[in-house]
A protein has these predicted regions:
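Short, well-structured N-terminal submotif of metal-dependent ribonuclease cores
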Residues: 1-37
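PIN-domain endoribonuclease scaffold, especially VapC-family toxins
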Residues: 27-82
């Protein structure tokens, strides 16, 4: 199973290792699933991870190291160009573009996200919520 993980799933999984997103990250760590990301997702994660610094005591250098490790473990693709009217929230276009690029290269089966705007596109694209993914694949 190869999946694109949205930034919100990565952040939740890192913040709460026993949560459903945390269980997905654990499956990735154990090699049960492969993850596809883009530099956009990695950069966004690098921007939002400082929110966890109070909870987990991460320094800026540790955050950089963590994101670099995730980049090494993931398949990194360049997001495909997506028309602005494809998504209600234009900020989600690079995430959708990451999924499309991965699908075009046969590198991913679906996008796992908690973003409601992206989930609304699930009839046109293989997009699942964290709960749907975990239920479907017994995670």
């Amino acid at each position: 199973m190869r999946i694109v993980l949205d930034t919100n799933v990565l952040l939740s999984g890192l913040a709460y290792p026993r949560s459903l997103p945390g269980r997905i990250l654990m499956q990735w760590h154990h090699g049960s699933i492969e993850v596809v990301l883009s530099n956009f997702i990695l950069d966004e994660l690098r921007r939002v991870l400082p929110r966890l610094s109070n909870r987990h005591g991460l320094t800026p250098a540790e955050i950089d190291d963590l994101v670099d490790i995730l980049a090494l473990q993931a398949e990194v693709v360049e997001p495909a160009a997506v028309l602005n009217d494809e998504c209600r929230d234009v900020d989600d276009l690079p995430i959708l573009g990451t999924l499309i690029a991965a699908l075009e290269r046969d590198q991913a089966d679906c996008l796992v996200t908690g973003d409601k705007d992206l989930l609304e596109l699930s009839e046109r694209y293989p997009i699942m919520s964290v709960a749907q993914f975990c239920e479907r694949y017994g995670i």
